[in-house]
Amino acid sequence: MAQIIKFVEDRRVLMACTILSIIMIMAFRELTQYLGAPMFDTLQGGYDMTTVRDFMLIYGDAGRQDYAYATLTLDGAFPLIYGTLSIGLLLKLAAFRFLRVLAILPLFLMGLDLYENVQLFSLLMQFPDLTVEAVARASTTTQIKGMAVMAVLAALVFQLLLRIILAAYRQFNVG
């Protein structure tokens, strides 16, 4: 476990994950442009059967196939990359040892994201034979994932602000 923690805290790993995350975000933006409609996992408010059917028709057969492929490849790797980055930053920023437990949040998010990818792949491959239940489950997962993203971002901001406050306090009391 200590080796894994050392790995994710390494500056080179953090830099590589940052660069890869940026590249992947740009690729997702291009994919969205190509598809002609938003990707389902970006709809943080969720979606319903009507939205799914409308978007699937906009994507077209080729778009659905490409989206499904990207869901298994690009979007399959993305949670591992941003998860490693988030875990590394949370561990590195932890002002107190007990705050390192916040690094569990990205693990939960990564699992949710991968589960969501499986659900979306299934919807893409089963179209037009979709069920309201399958769409509702995928939508709920997307909404929960959105909340998990906010929790991870809040933990990162909290850790960073705490570091800044402690550094200012030390500077004020030393100087």
Language-model features, listed with the residues they occupy:
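Membrane-interface helix-boundary motifs at transmembrane edges
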Residues: F7-V8, L91-R100, A168-Y169
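Hydrophobic alpha-helical transmembrane segments
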Residues: A70-L91
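Alpha-helical transmembrane segments of multi-pass membrane proteins
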Residues: P106-L112
